Structure formats: structure tokens, C-alpha cells
Amino acid sequence: MRDISDTIARLSAMRGRPAGAGQSKDDHLSEMTGFGSNPGALRARFYLPENLPKQAALVVVLHGCTQNAAAYDHGSGWTELAAEQGFAVLLPEQQRANNANLCFNWFVPGDVSRDSGEALSIRQMIEAAVVTHGLDRKRIFVTGLSAGGAMAAVMLATYPDVFAGGAIIAGLAYGSASTIPEAFDRMRGHGGPSRSDLQRLLREASPHKGAWPRISVWQGSADTTVVPSNADAVLAQWQGVHGLAQAPTRTEKVDGQGRKVWCDGKGRDVVEAYSIAGMGHGTPLQASGDNALGKAGPFMLDVGISSTRHIARFWGLTKPDVRRAAKAEAASGTALQPFSPKEKPRAVRVDPAPEPVNPPSGPAGGITKVIEDALRAAGLMR
């Protein structure tokens, strides 16, 4: 744990972020309703390209804090790539009633357990999309940025039987935090579970005994919001279940950036990690040139490499020279079939007690107000 002055500084910095930085008016996504009990109270957006092939793949895309589904899609280019290559995209969206800063609640115990909270809501959306549109259950993938990357880690840990692969961009390892102070400390690289505990947390998150998803990890070397040691923790967690050594099988340069690859006993690439030199907090893009995809903006960083294209290729979703002539437009949906597992009760979220009529004056009262104001602005307190 850091001292109180460090905590106040971090909270105050989050309070200064523009509320609408990640919002977008360019929205061609469709709405998904009636997908289940939705215990996490999330919104579901989706996109189907024209002439979608039978048994198409599904990519689940999770936005970061201060963003919404349309804004993250506009920046990352996932539906643009889906139109080009022929797969479906599901974009869960956080609501302000759950989190004032629109962060997925990646460390709240009631939201990150199998069959409860936000994790179950996303699972229900996936089931509804697969059943309604005849998608391929063997080709379901999940990716996300920051809090969305941490939530992607949650989904991969709690439902490894659902996903063929995942990609975590500037995210955090599953189970690395369960409280607000722990979340801030992990983001800054302070403390956290040991390598063996990270691997144990992953194994205990589900009853899964089969093959594990392939994992792609992306991190900016100059990220001070979610520091690079978090990528190391994610890698350590997944190296365990895949039976991999800490040292990579090979290292190489891709579009001028460092890539490490870990292969399984059959020689298949099962874990990869990109370190983007000099990049801060955000999703790496190539917004110009022959392979341009996405648009630069807040937390969407044009650094000359498209994480979206490379992730899709790692999953086997794309072929470099195959492009469909399609335009990203709204897709019309049909009635959705609810998914109803044995749902675990979600802990009631308790609002903070009202402030006293005469709050304490002096330094202590001032510190309390700064902390509470910043927590609310950061989406960590209601």
C-alpha cells in the first residue's frame, strides 16, 4: 500500500479526466435485448456484416474507462475488420449506474466470479448471439483495453470453456485485486499475488479441465496508468496452465516492435506478448498506410502497428490477402434466446453513508472530501 498522499494524488489525477473523452457519435452498432437475467446490468451492442458466413466466428470487445462500445469500436476498427473478413462482433457496454467512470468492475468479487454479476451478463450475451445467429462455438474470442482488458482476463479465467483465445491490452491479471486500494496498487505495479498464486487463482476460477485459450498480451513500455509489470503478471498466470517456461520460445520484431512467443509441446503458438516501445496507456493502432485500421483518439494510439489486425491473425481469424467488399453498417437482429445457468447471487452494492450535516473541518475533513470526490469521479464510489 502507498501512503495517503500518494493515494490522493492518484485519485485527483483521475478526477481531472474529461468525462466525454471516450464517447463517439459514429455509431453503427445494433442493440441486443432480452439476452437473459443480466445480473450485471450491462448494455449489449453487436455488429453483423452483410452476408455473414454460416458458423462465423464471434469476437467480444470490451471498452476501457470513460469509453463506450461505439467509441472503442471506432478507434480500434473491430467492426471494420469484421466487415472485411466476415465475423460477428459483440460489444458489451458499461452503464453509469454501475460505474460512474464507465469502467468494467474487474476487481469487484460479485462481478468477476463464474455465473455472477457482470461476468454472467457477458456470458449471457455470448450465448444469445451464438444461438440467434448460428455462430461457431469453437471460435469465440475476447479482447479489451485497460479495465476492459482486465475484464477480458476475467472472462478467460471464469469461462475458459467458452473462448478459443483472448487478448489483453494494458490490462491486469485475474484475481490480482479485490478492493479499491488493491486495484490502484496493482495498476501501479505495487504488491500483488505471487506467480504460483496467480496460476492457482486461474485454475480455481472454473471447473475447466480441457484445452486453454490462446492468449495475446499487449503493453506500452511507457504506460504509467497500468504499468508494464502487469503484463508480466498476465503472462505468468497463463504460462502456468499452458505448461510453459518463463523464457519465450522465440523473440522477433513485428512492424518494428518486440514480440515474444511461447509454443506448446506440439510447436503451436499459444501465448504471445508485444511490448510497444515508448507507448503510453492505450490500444496500439496503425491509422494510416496500406493496412490502416481504426482512428486515433483518446487512449487509441497511432504507433504504426495495428493490434487489432495482429490479434485477429494470431487467433486465425484473418488471411492477409483476403478482404471482403463490405461496409460497416447497422445489422438487424432477431429475437434472442436467453441463457440461464445456475446463477449465483450478486452481493448488494451499498451506497456510502450520507455525509454529516457538519463535516469535520481542518486537514482531516479536507482529505476525506478529496478522496470521496475523486473516488466518485473515478467511478470507484457511488
Describe the residue ranges of each PLM region.
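Alpha/beta-hydrolase active-site loop
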Residues: G110-H133, V154
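Short substrate-entry loop that stabilizes the transition state in hydrolases
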Residues: L52-A100, S176
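Conserved alpha/beta-hydrolase "acid-adjacent" motif
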Residues: T225-N230, P284-L285
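The conserved beta1-alpha1 loop
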Residues: V60-T66, A170, Q219, A277
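Short beta-strand/loop motif that positions the catalytic acidic residue
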Residues: V217-Q219, D223
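A domain-start/cap signature at the N-terminus of enzymes
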Residues: M1-L58, A70-S76, E84, R137, ...
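Cap/lid segment of the alpha/beta-hydrolase catalytic domain
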Residues: E93-G117, I180
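Primarily recognizes the serine-hydrolase "nucleophile elbow" in alpha/beta-hydrolase
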Residues: V130-T132, D136-G210, T224
